[in-house]
Amino acid sequence: MKRTALKIGYIGTNFHGFQRQPDLRTVEEELIYHLRKLGYIDDLKKSRFRIAGRTDAGVHSLGNVISFQSEKEVRVNEINNSLPDDIQILAKAPVRFGFKPRYAEMRQYRYVLFRSDLDLYKLNEVAEIFKGTHNFTNFTKRFQKTTTRTIDDIKITKANLNDYHKKEFPNLHDTLSPVFVDIYGESFLWNMVRKMMRVFVDVAIGKLSLEKVEELLNPAENDPRANIKVLDPDYLILMDIKYDGVKFVYDDYACERFKRNLVDSLGDLQRKYAIRESMIKSLEDLERIN
């Protein structure tokens, strides 16, 4: 019996999070159903089915990881042919029997900011403050044994839109120029990235000082937890998870297939955008008539 790790891509908008929930569509439920259907797993305990990260509803992924044991040789495209278009296996790796995907060497999250009023210099300043080891108790909703985490790196870049996006959504991209915030670390608390992004935005628009950020990362023992509102999950992507000694091999056909699925979903978004744009235009015409 061999143990295999799989790297998963999915469109989070279509799921109620990763973890199984009664009567709700989740990524984990879809994966288990199709792996069972194809004969890769049966009993979850015997197959030692494990997951790396429980992303919230709306959060997307290009790199979440699951692992399991199976007598059957794992064939990526056989699984993808069974899975729905909004979730696909992108890569696989053989792993040791005791491998647990939650214990990663590095995780990379990307948050995409769509605001024209952001000061990029201030964004980079606040990024420098967050790098390193801190007490993130103010950046999670749950009480945990330890809230100390280390941010290895944060990269902030203006997005380069390719010709396809410019052609399909010309009006949209005339007004919105997204900023990518890529955050790297071994592990993250629940809601930590989205709360961090709220602070990033507040600093970049002049609503919050860098001194206050320092205070949030160095709370006194008896300080009440700060009420930091999370930013929307729809703009967060789990980009990658890496492990010491584990080499994932990406399947070219699987990656191309998922890319096509994403392009197809863009077409649907374009139609929805056009409908809303036509409704706005009609209302503006009414205002001129009146």
UniProtKB/Swiss-Prot annotation:
Keyword annotations: Isomerase, tRNA processing
Enzyme active site: 56
Record-listed E.C. numbers: 5.4.99.12
Catalytic reactions on record: uridine(38/39/40) in tRNA = pseudouridine(38/39/40) in tRNA
Gene Ontology annotations of biological process type: tRNA pseudouridine synthesis
Record has Phosphoprotein as a keyword: no
InterPro entries named among the record's database cross-references: PsdUridine_synth_cat_dom_sf, PsdUridine_synth_TruA, PsdUridine_synth_TruA_a/b_dom, PsdUridine_synth_TruA_C, TruA/RsuA/RluB/E/F_N
Any Pfam family the entry gives: PseudoU_synth_1
Sequence positions that bind substrate: 109
Gene3D superfamilies: Pseudouridine synthase I, catalytic domain, C-terminal subdomain, Pseudouridine synthase I, catalytic domain, N-terminal subdomain
GO molecular function terms noted in the UniProt entry: RNA binding; tRNA pseudouridine(38-40) synthase activity
Keyword flag Isomerase: yes
Catalytic EC class: isomerase
Cited function: Formation of pseudouridine at positions 38, 39 and 40 in the anticodon stem and loop of transfer RNAs.
Family that this chain belongs to: Belongs to the tRNA pseudouridine synthase TruA family.
Protein name: tRNA pseudouridine synthase A
Chain's gene name: truA
